[in-house]
């Protein structure tokens, strides 16, 4: 049977029935419709994964795979802590997870983007390049994140860390497009950011009357997991890909037999990302209540059972970062993260404090966002570091010794690390705002007909989250381990967190705003380091 390929209004159709066209020509997805195929059909199950290379034909490859840095440029040791500028722990926790993402960090340290970027302002890639370079090249220090990293997002109160994370990833993806503003949506999925974090879902509907199959493909940058009925990440993934029966009022209108008939609908991962961002849905959109249950997650995760093809061998990912929310609900708490340095040692990154940790402590957290990288990618980056660096990896016997050597000396945190290059600071004013980003997210939300499981948002936009210092008693159970601090502020100098987390909150733009509720009466002056 001859295969017809048709491009319709931003949509690529692969159709075995030349007289049939999609009823949704304006949607940004690729669809395949076919009847029962013989075993040696060109589109049989054995070759379906290969089709993903053709389901999104591109007019222009924005980031050729051969241009991605292959060797690691990252220092082996852990980098700097981040100063809290007043309810910005959600920013710091997210930035640390991105900083220790090997493919992203290697690209940033190559400085390839800033050498070719022609934008004068609003480039998130330039801003992140400057931040990651400073953070990784200043171990033992505390640096102040650039105001431009949260410009347009931070509003003087604590926001949701996952929203900020994806806001930043989306801004970096858009920064890959200057000069290519007219490219089609398939070309946009060839950007550096999509090659690192992105993949494709496949939603397959099989008509139980004629056995015709319709495949819909949609890109993703993160994966949201419903944990209400799951005790582990693996269980949540199993629920996500569990087939759904469409019958009765929900019967499927088949595009092959043109009848309304019962059908089965299955969501699977069609192509895998180099880096997986798994979001555990801990917060209710309606009440803001937190699901404070322990959800088990492994150090090594095999994603093969959740792929479109399950007979191609293991697809193993290794954990390298965990973003944690500590507290009772979305209305209070504190964000911090755990990251795995290139040397293989885990560290707890809690604003300015950088503390050596163990995998046992890492796996016992009430995780909010999990970061996994393909094992082959991690090993490749680790091997290149071990060949190119002088000091050996930090072993368990070294951890305690180095952690008890006392406080590391440092000057004022704002003056310790090298300043940003002027031309990068000039570019660092972000054009997007939080409200505009949320509007675009609603506009680009996955089509209802694609979803097998509804993925709700994380936090209501008007939620006020109180910072750690006000609710220490509510978080004591989240810090069971007694770890040796590698990086502390001087005991004689009050920390910025202590002076900024109560009373009036300061935005990164330096404008004091009132907090809500019982803090309304407070008008303490705040010191914001410029």
UniProtKB/Swiss-Prot annotation:
Active site: 89 (nucleophile), 334 (proton acceptor)
Catalytic reaction list: Thiol-dependent hydrolysis of ester, thioester, amide, peptide and isopeptide bonds formed by the C-terminal Gly of ubiquitin (a 76-residue protein attached to proteins as an intracellular targeting signal)
Compartments in which it is found: Nucleus; Endoplasmic reticulum
Enzyme class: hydrolase
Protein's organism: Homo sapiens
InterPro entries: HABP4_PAIRBP1-bd, Papain-like_cys_pep_sf, Peptidase_C19, Peptidase_C19_UCH, USP_CS, USP_dom
UniProt biased composition (Low complexity): 484-495
Protein name (record): Ubiquitin carboxyl-terminal hydrolase 17-like protein 19
Domain USP: 80-375
GO molecular function: cysteine-type deubiquitinase activity
């Amino acid at each position: 049977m001859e295969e017809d390929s048709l491009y319709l209004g931003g949509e690529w159709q692969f159709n075995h029935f030349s007289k049939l066209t999609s009823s949704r020509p304006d949607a940004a997805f690729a669809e395949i419709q076919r009847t029962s195929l013989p075993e040696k059909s060109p589109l049989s199950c054995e070759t379906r994964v290969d089709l993903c290379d053709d389901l999104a034909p591109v007019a222009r490859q924005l980031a050729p795979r051969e241009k991605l840095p292959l060797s690691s440029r990252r220092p082996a040791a852990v980098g700097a802590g981040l100063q809290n500028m007043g309810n910005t722990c959600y920013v710091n926790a997210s930035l640390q997870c991105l900083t220790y993402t090997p493919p992203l960090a290697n690209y940033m340290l190559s400085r390839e983007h800033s050498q070719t970027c022609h934008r004068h302002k609003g480039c998130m890639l330039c801003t992140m390049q400057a931040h990651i370079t400073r953070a990784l090249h200043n171990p033992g220090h505390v640096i102040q994140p650039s105001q431009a990293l949260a410009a347009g997002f931070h509003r003087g109160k604590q926001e949701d860390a996952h929203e900020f994370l994806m806001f930043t990833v989306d801004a970096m993806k858009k920064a890959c497009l200057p000069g290519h503003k007219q490219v089609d949506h398939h070309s946009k999925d060839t950007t550096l950011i999509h090659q690192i974090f992105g993949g494709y879902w496949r939603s397959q509907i099989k008509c139980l009357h004629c056995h015709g199959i319709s495949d819909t493909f949609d890109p993703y940058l993160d994966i949201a997991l419903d944990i209400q009925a799951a005790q582990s990440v693996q269980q949540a993934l199993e629920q996500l890909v569990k087939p759904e029966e469409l019958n009765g009022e929900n019967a499927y209108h088949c595009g092959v037999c043109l009848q309304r008939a019962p059908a089965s609908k299955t969501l699977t991962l069609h192509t895998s990302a180099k880096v997986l961002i798994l979001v555990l849905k801990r917060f209710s959109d309606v009440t803001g209540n937190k699901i404070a249950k322990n959800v088990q997650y492994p150090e090594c995760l095999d994603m093969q059972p959740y792929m479109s093809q399950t007979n191609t061998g293991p697809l193993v990912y290794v954990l390298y970062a965990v973003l944690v929310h500590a507290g009772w609900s979305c209305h209070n708490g504190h964000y911090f993260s755990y990251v795995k340095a290139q040397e293989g040692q885990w560290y707890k990154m809690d604003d300015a404090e950088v503390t050596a940790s163990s995998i046992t402590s890492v796996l016992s957290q009430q995780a909010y966002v999990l970061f996994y990288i393909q094992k082959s990618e991690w090993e490749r980056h680790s091997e290149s570091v071990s060949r190119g660096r002088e000091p050996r990896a930090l072993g368990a016997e070294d951890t305690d010794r180095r952690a008890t050597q006392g406080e590391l000396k440092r000057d004022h945190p704002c003056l310790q690390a090298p300043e940003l290059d002027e031309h990068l600071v000039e570019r660092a004013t972000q054009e997007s705002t939080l409200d505009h980003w949320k509007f675009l997210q609603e506009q680009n939300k996955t089509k209802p007909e694609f979803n097998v499981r509804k993925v709700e948002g994380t936090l209501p936009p008007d939620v006020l989250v109180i910072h750690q210092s006000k609710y220490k008693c509510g978080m004591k159970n989240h810090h069971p381990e007694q770890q040796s601090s590698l990086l502390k502020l001087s005991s004689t100098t009050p920390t910025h967190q202590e002076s900024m987390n109560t009373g009036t909150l300061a935005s990164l733009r330096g404008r004091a705003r009132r907090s809500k509720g019982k803090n309304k009466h407070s008008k303490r002056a705040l010191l914001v380091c410029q």
